Amino acid sequence: MASLKNKHFMIGLSLTFIVALFSFLAAKLPILDKVGALTIAILIAILYRHFRGYPEQYSSGITFSSKYLLRFAIILYGLKLNIFDIIGQGSKLLAIDVGVVIFSIVMMLFVNKLLHGDKNIALLLGVGTGVCGAAAIAAVAPIFKSREKDTAISIGIIALIGTIFSLIYTAIYAIFSMTTNVYGAWSGVSLHEIAHVVLAGGFGGSDALKIALLGKLGRVFLLIPLTIVLILIMRFRSSESSSKGRISIPYFLIGFVIMALVNTYVTIPSALLNILNTVSTICLLMAMVALGLNVAFKDLKNRALKPLMTIIITSICLSSLAFIVVHWLYS
């Protein structure tokens, strides 16, 4: 019996790994490199669920990917941060980043209220838009006690919209006259994922990409204080409503902070850092596959339309406002 359970666990884990690896490699191909591995992974998982159903017998391995590998990926995500660079070279951008995070969450909730959408998904999208996309959504989902299908829908939406916006940014840069500093800073402080920032920022050249990454990593850094604030708010609300259902601290975020400190104070060989970043990406993709398997097409039909409209409106407003601020500071 135990061996059968172990076999089912390994099959479930292998399923998420195979789809994740395929998505990782497919995203390196022309055209698909614009779509992104996250989007590919989630779409494959949702299509698998639609045509084959949820593989219930392998759920232990799938759940392991959606919970433990996701947390491990977020811990390793901290290795992307160098706190000295963000506070030093990127201090001006960090000030903008604070405004971006606050604006994204508040605007998302405001538009969502007008559209009578799902508040939990709007919160996830607000944090994802303001901070760092899928990783931020996954990090705060336990704080909001979000359902896995809501987390998956939010991540799928933000991956798709971020890709579209990054392509729009490259078109705007090609058509209109814009300095590399303005373009890089604008991309860094307003696009959703690091991958989107790399895609758009890289189009402006190495100087634009450098400042874009500084702007983006400042937002990743803000995940630390933001989660603390959110935990305090949710704990206060839970204590007001009842003593039950206390909000626990997502301890993997402590690992995220430790990794950020390690990368700041310890010189890690670039080869090792590349390996760890790849491991982090694969683990994150495996988690996305596992989350995507929890989403049926009827969920997308019933729950994704209003959040999609909400994030489009919010992203347009954020991009416009961010451009005005960046143009004023860097022109």
Curated annotation (Swiss-Prot):
Pfam families: Cons_hypoth698 (PF03601). It is a multi-pass membrane protein. This is UPF0324 membrane protein SACOL0411. The keyword ATP-binding does not apply. Its main location: membrane. Keywords: Cell membrane, Membrane, Transmembrane, Transmembrane helix. The chain crosses the membrane at residues 9-26, 31-48, 69-88, 93-115, 122-144, 154-176, 183-202, 217-234, 247-269, 273-295, 308-330. Belongs to the UPF0324 family. The lineage of its organism: Bacteria, Bacillati, Bacillota, Bacilli, Bacillales. Signal peptide: none annotated. One of its GO terms (cellular component) is plasma membrane. It is found in: Cell membrane. InterPro entries: UPF0324_pro. PANTHER family: INNER MEMBRANE PROTEIN YEIH-RELATED, UPF0324 INNER MEMBRANE PROTEIN YEIH.
